[in-house]
Amino acid sequence: MLNDIEVLSKPDTNYWTSTAYRVPDVPNHTVKPGDKGFRLIPVTSNAPRSFITNVQNGDKLKVRAETLVRGIAFGGDCGVARVDTSIDDGKSWQPTQLGPDEGKYSLRQRQTQFTLPAGGARTLMARCTNTVGLAQPSFPVWNPSGYLYNTIESTHVIAT
């Protein structure tokens, strides 16, 4: 519950705003582990992200049977425009059905149905694109604090 709001006439100097919530001032705020000499800036926005919530790594899914995959997504600092799902390790993507839009900062439920055509190991992926066109990247965003990590999540399953 919100108890009070404090309005400041200058930037806050508490630990969280002056030291903790900071990322490298470089494209995508990503650096290599061990890199030094970059300027840090405050985190002022968030990045789109999507999760698969009803299928776990190692699950066995039936071949040639309809499979429902559910999840959630958020657009970061704006709304969710779309979520796409891949059943072939990101080689192809299909649109996902989105649940109600409860506002630009809310989580959106999502679901999609698919049929696995053959047996074997499969990688399921979900990729969110927000309303300003920013999509989750396929590469990891790494920085010393771990903020703004939004790489496309992978769920490894076995088709049987």
Whereabouts are the PLM-identified features?
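Extended, aromatic/histidine-rich regions of cofactor-dependent oxidoreductases associated
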Residues: 1-160
